[in-house]
Structures are given as structure tokens and as C-alpha cells.
Amino acid sequence: MSVTDELLANNARYAESFHGPLPLPPSKHVAVVACMDARIDVYRVLGLQEGEAHVIRNAGGVVTDDGIRSLAISQRLLGTTRSSWSTTPTAGC
């Protein structure tokens, strides 16, 4: 089985047991900018559940022009507040 096939099968299993629908705006009104480090599960690290936050990931966990665009949409259209933005850089990234 290819990695793509495995991911598609995992997605199908997830969809079968998904307890939704969840509203599009995050329930905790928080947006997190995080490093794309595959070792880090941002939701678990921060104690978040599905639907509670927007997680925006990129190399270095820094706010770039693209990050600003994503944060602006998160705030203006989907209700996160500026004071709740957080960055979670990791060591050795």
C-alpha cells in the first residue's frame, strides 16, 4: 500500500467516526502560528480539541506575509481575536 493509499484509508476511517458538524469559527477564538515540525502535535501540546483553534503552520513558526493573510482571515471572517494569537516555535527547527 502506498503512503497515499494509507492516508486515504485513514481519512475514510476518520470520516466514519467524525462527530460533527463543527462550526467553522474556532470555539476558543484562538489562532496559533506554529512550526511545521512533524514531531509536534500542536493540538495535543496545547490541550486543544478539534474545532477549538486555527493552527497555521510554516517553516520556523514565524509570521510571514502569508501568515498575516491567514491570521487576517481568521480574525476578520472567523472570529479569532488578536490578543489570542500565539506562536509556538520549537528548538532545533
Q: Which residues make up each language-model segment?
A:
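Short, conserved "active-site rim" segments that organize catalytic pockets and cofactor/ligand binding
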Residues: 1-63
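Short HxH-centered metal-ligating active-site micro-motif
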Residues: 51-93
